[in-house]
Amino acid sequence: MTEQEKKVSFGFESVSEEEKTQKVGEVFDSVSEQYDLMNDLMSFGIHRFWKRFALMHTGLEEGMKALDVASGTGDLGVLLQDQVGESGTVILTDINASMLHQGRSKLLDQGKLKNMQLLQANAENLPFEDNMFDCVTIAFGLRNITDKNAALS
């Protein structure tokens, strides 16, 4: 079976890997402006607790470097920034330009871009050297990644 013939799940559909990437992009383009509100409503706000709970286990300290993959609008990045402090660095990546645009606007309004960088990048092929970060996180974005093994390697 060739790469083009390989089928993956997208909701209740079976689609090609390329088609899934395109469809996921279209979904997030269409919801980016309301993404934060949508997360709050769909999870009854519990996603905020889950993110805080996860970050209790990062081991991050002042001055460290963190990477958040599939960052969306940057909620997790703000919490990571609190852990690494002003002398640390947080890099947020997302494949979707609309989500990064919303995140950048929100973070700029909150005054949170000091030691934070946003980069459009595919989680399956990140442009970073190995062992460059003290901590790497990914929240709910993992469910939308086509090749999870590539993203997690």
Task: State each model region's role.
Residues 145-153:
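A short, conserved alpha-helix within the catalytic core of class I
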Residues 65-125:
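Class I SAM-dependent methyltransferase SAM/SAH-binding core
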Residues 34, 44-64, 79:
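Conserved alpha-helix/loop element of class I SAM-dependent methyltransferases that forms part
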